[in-house]
Amino acid sequence: MSNESQVSEAPVNFGANLGYVLDLYDIYLDNPSAVPEDLQVLFSTIKNGEANIATNTEGQSNVTKGDSTIKRVMRLIDNIRQYGHLLADIYPVNRPQRENVPKLNMEDFNLDQETLESISAGIVSEHFKDIYDNAYEAIVRMEKRYKGPIAFEYTHINNNRERVWLKRRIETPYKATLNDNQKIELFKNLAHVEGFEKYLHKNFVGAKRFSIEGVDTLVPMLQQTLRIASDEGIQNIQIGMAHRGRLNVLTHVLEKPYEMMISEFMHIDPMKFLPEDGSLQLTSGWTGDVKYHLGGVKTTQSYGSEQRISLANNPSHLEIVAPVVLGKTRANQDTTDKPGAVTTEFKKSMPILIHGDAAYPGQGINFEAMNLGNLEGYSTGGSLHIITNNRIGFTTEPEDGRSTTYSSDVAKGYDVPIMHVNADNVEATIEAIEIAMAFRKEFNKDVVIDLVGYRRYGHNEMDEPSITNPLQYYEIRKHESVDILYGKQLVNENIISENQMNQIFDDVQNTLRAAHDKIDKNDKMDNPDMQKPDSLAEPIQTKDEEVSYEQLKEINDAMLSYPSDFNVLKKLNKVLEKRREPFESEDGLVDWAQAEQLAFATITQNGRPIRLTGQDSERGTFSHRHAVLHDPDTGAQYVPLHNVPDQKATFEVRNSPLSEAAVVGFEYGYNIQNKSCMTIWEAQYGDFSNMAQMIFDNFLFSSRAKWGERSGLTLFLPHSFEGQGPEHSSARLERFLQLAGENNSTIVNLSSSSNYFHLLRAQAANLGTQSMRPLVVMSPKSLLRNKTVADPISKFTSGKFEPILPEAHDKASVKKVILASGKMFIDLKEYLTKNPNKSILLVAVERLYPFPADEIDALLSELPNLEHVAWVQEEPKNQGAWSFVYPYLKELTTDKYDLSYHGRIQRSAPAEGDGEIHKLVQNMIIEQSTNIN
């Protein structure tokens, strides 16, 4: 057996990074003259088989007396790279005690200075041989680097090119990029960051502000990020963060004036101090929100070329804003105002996500959001993650809050580099940003920086942390703030004098005091306007521009025309060819899927882009949509909606990962950034949508009232009771109706394909306007192919969306009106078709919110012999629409007609688990509700 085969089969197991020397050794085995002469000598000492390099179960290198010197050196080098972070100087206070740290010293490997001085520095890294005289100097440098104020973790990364890039960037001697003037400017920025907090602490005692103190360097890190982004031509920055440090970021990154911030603490209208040049955009709703949830948008040239910096509005639900920011970023990167497919340019925008050390590993939304990072439909070219690590979560310390060494460890599964940096080492934090931004630019991947600091006060400024964390806070209270530490450093470096340092501190306080003095203390907000805007006074406008028969036929023909070299699966082709029938026969009907396709096509013809995502949305959960066709012979894909005649905007459909919260958050963010785009999320089954309940509750339905943030996101939630059990029946309609108020949404449960067509077009027409709002569709399952739902093409070329659809009736004969929606209406219609009764008028309530009370009232008033009104639903009485519609129906029927409910009784689970029992219950509901007596 040759040396080469022995080495290639050896159990070399140093983690992901084996070190540059092992690569050279492989080259040496193949061609000794291809490596430097000094290494040829060293490699020649390795006997056959001795290159079997392994590690023990603790991850520490096995060292035996018989090991060659070169192998021991390589083990030492590899251990420093892989485990040096465990001994790094990254803790400003309360350094944790490490146990079972792998061997990281020369002595552990039977090495000494003299031995290492006799070895070339090239054994450590190729470029070291031109920098250092020998391996000893190189290893000393490595130890300082890997055990310094930045701790590096990258050996877990699978991609060799990324590992090599990081290794060389880290190990190349760092040349300071900060000159004296830049250091002074950095110090002044820190003085403002810390001085702002101290001023608020002194003048607004006990007021909640969630101070940044302890991780103050976050602000200069962000400022440096913006400078680098500007140099790279990135003009749009999207930032997401929670409440900790938010006021400081608003003030010193987005340049919100001190007067505005102080006004908010005084409960005085801050908008009086909004810059008149329009550079700062702050929106608010009619109910408002606490100051540390609010965001803003700043257009500035402070960091180089003109940039638009956005800080996303955020609820108290930690980390949930992350996918929203990713969606906003992707919307900025996508070009959608052209026909066909979307094009994405990462350089247009970048996301910065600021996390908390307790929340980052604690909240599952981070796993979901990071999983989006390299997916074609969701990637943003790499997020910069900064963990503001104050090493405590409210009162919970790390050992009770996570099962890992670092709060950042969850990111390792996503193959991204991690840097831990001492928040008190100002210049190290700047270097960490520079490395992160360079890596992102090179590889378009996420990077995580763990900014390790502390929290100066309790969770909020009214909290006393010594009650639960006395030892930690004993040390923190003795610890000087970073602005003082850095100021003293500059004094010691003779860059500034002590008097200059103190003068800068005084200047900051004087600036804040002057801003405070501008505010009239008596100018209180006594009568705040909490009325919703006039644009929400009415339901969404549903007037539809008519579409000609010729236009729809041209679209339909185009959808059924394929490239000459593309084959459609024969079985599927038969299904699709049936879509010609509505245009070829009077008996032809347009089903749900075809109605949707025609609506989408006309919407893009009108210049509205469409983005549809969800699990299995390309085909459709129920194999109905077929928006992406697959050639059975070649696997090639074809999207018919990229072939729409006279198309003016893009169509995009994506299968999403198996996630609800992050994907819905992403689509919400996409929509609020590109308000003209018809952004749609489709649940695989509506039952699973409650995995995204936080997005519905805290963003979609309340964002406009809280923050003035308009959304027109559309939800498709398959919903109907069909004997498939309690987890495949209900989209929890009742929860969406509970969230409905102040005309904040449109919620429908439809029974007509043409009404669906008109609704989608109406929703699209309102996008980008002040009247836009979310649309929630309880979409069908079995009804997708039900001919009762399908309509002739004539209903598509005229009309508009109708909130109620009464069946044909003789007004004088009607004694009972049955109101129902969705599949319940269709079941009743099919029953009454077989068992006609002129005394009963069946009415489809297509729009549940805003409830069509006026339309129903007008209908009832036309029925002279009406005695009874019944609401019929599939869902249990405590679920579905009944609790919501009852007050409206009670008001309409009081002193006029009897009112009754028909449906399942109150249940804790939505539906029966047995299909036969389901049929019995469903039939009972139908028979009881249609009994005229």
UniProtKB/Swiss-Prot annotation:
Instruction: List GO terms (cellular component aspect).
Output: cytosol; oxoglutarate dehydrogenase complex
- Give the residue range of the signal peptide: none
Instruction: Please give the Gene Ontology molecular function terms for this protein.
Output: oxoglutarate dehydrogenase (succinyl-transferring) activity; thiamine pyrophosphate binding
Pfam families, alphabetized = E1_dh, OxoGdeHyase_C, Transket_pyr
Oxidoreductase found in the keyword field? yes
- The superkingdom of the source organism is Bacteria
Q: Which GO terms describe its biological process?
A: glycolytic process; tricarboxylic acid cycle
- SMART domains given in the database record: Transket_pyr
What keywords are assigned to this protein? Glycolysis, Oxidoreductase, Thiamine pyrophosphate
Q: What is its EC number?
A: 1.2.4.2
Q: Which reaction does it catalyse?
A: N(6)-[(R)-lipoyl]-L-lysyl-[protein] + 2-oxoglutarate + H(+) = N(6)-[(R)-S(8)-succinyldihydrolipoyl]-L-lysyl-[protein] + CO2
Required co-factor? Answer: thiamine diphosphate
| Keyword Oxidoreductase carried by entry | yes
What PANTHER family does this protein's entry cite?
Answer: 2-OXOADIPATE DEHYDROGENASE COMPLEX COMPONENT E1 (PTHR23152:SF4), 2-OXOGLUTARATE DEHYDROGENASE (PTHR23152)
Similarity section: Belongs to the alpha-ketoglutarate dehydrogenase family.
User: Could you describe the subunit structure of this protein?
Assistant: Homodimer. Part of the 2-oxoglutarate dehydrogenase (OGDH) complex composed of E1 (2-oxoglutarate dehydrogenase), E2 (dihydrolipoamide succinyltransferase) and E3 (dihydrolipoamide dehydrogenase); the complex contains multiple copies of the three enzymatic components (E1, E2 and E3).
Q: What does this protein do?
A: E1 component of the 2-oxoglutarate dehydrogenase (OGDH) complex which catalyzes the decarboxylation of 2-oxoglutarate, the first step in the conversion of 2-oxoglutarate to succinyl-CoA and CO(2).
For this entry, the protein name equals 2-oxoglutarate dehydrogenase E1 component
Question: What is the protein's species of origin?
Answer: Staphylococcus saprophyticus subsp. saprophyticus (strain ATCC 15305 / DSM 20229 / NCIMB 8711 / NCTC 7292 / S-41)
